[in-house]
């Protein structure tokens, strides 16, 4: 486990790719947040005698529901994209957020790149063993023409994910003590998150409803152009673009 974490996440592979000017992103999904006038941990400065009022109990409100922020953090440029989902936290949602990062930020910064490194947890919406996860990066490869190298953190090491402390920890500080009254408020708070080192965040709502329980046919899995690493190939693999596919 230590070899995996120090050798891949913080050492040789990202450093090598960064030295070549290739993109390295760390992706993760923040916990779902209730949308509405609910108490939020922490505090903020308010005029004396005018505290923000919030109910003592939190229940999901019809028509508002929950928000699931999924982030892609560009390790080299200290900037990130966040898609705020309004449905299930699925593999399709994760891949959609990765595509949004590429379309909105990555393409302009890494035009002509031949490979992308994605560092992520081994569970949640991007599990290494998930059949639903891998067709997504394959479609991304076919469309972008890049190889996508995926490195999943092994169980018990999710705190090594850079998206957690570089991005989501800062977002939590930004909205502490603030009721997340609407999706617009959530997007505004996330997009205005910054740090003393110059973190830049862009954000948008993903309005698509993602369904759970979707099955991937064996034929679709067999069509994925994947090369697994000798060391824990279920965690480390490269997906390549297929010739002739858009």
Model feature map: region roles:
Residues 29-33, 74-76, 122-124, 154-157:
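Short, flexible loop/turn elements at secondary-structure junctions
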Residues 128, 150-172:
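RNase H-like two-metal-ion nuclease catalytic core shared by retroviral integrases
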């Amino acid at each position: 486990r230590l070899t995996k974490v120090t050798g891949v996440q913080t050492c040789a592979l990202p450093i090598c790719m960064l030295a070549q000017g290739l993109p390295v992103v760390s992706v993760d999904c923040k916990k779902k947040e209730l949308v509405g006038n609910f108490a939020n941990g922490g505090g903020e400065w308010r005029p004396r005698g005018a505290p923000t009022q919030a109910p003592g109990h939190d229940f999901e409100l019809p028509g508002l529901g929950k928000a699931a922020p999924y982030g892609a953090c560009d390790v080299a440029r200290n900037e990130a994209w966040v898609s705020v989902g309004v449905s299930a936290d699925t593999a399709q949602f994760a891949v959609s957020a990765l595509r949004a990062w590429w379309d909105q930020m990555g393409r302009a910064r890494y035009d002509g790149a031949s490979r992308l490194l994605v560092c992520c947890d081994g569970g949640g919406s991007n599990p290494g063993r998930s059949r639903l996860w891998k067709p997504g990066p394959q479609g991304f490869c076919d469309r972008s023409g890049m190889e996508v190298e995926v490195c999943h953190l092994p169980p018990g090491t999710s705190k090594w994910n850079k998206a957690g402390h570089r991005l989501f920890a800062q977002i939590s500080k930004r909205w502490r003590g603030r009721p997340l009254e609407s999706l617009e408020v959530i997007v505004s708070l996330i997009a205005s998150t910054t740090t003393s080192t110059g973190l830049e965040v862009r954000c948008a709502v993903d309005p698509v409803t993602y369904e759970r329980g979707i099955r991937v046919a064996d034929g679709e899995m067999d069509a994925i152009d994947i090369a697994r690493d000798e060391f824990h190939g279920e965690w480390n693999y490269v997906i390549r673009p297929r010739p002739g596919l858009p």
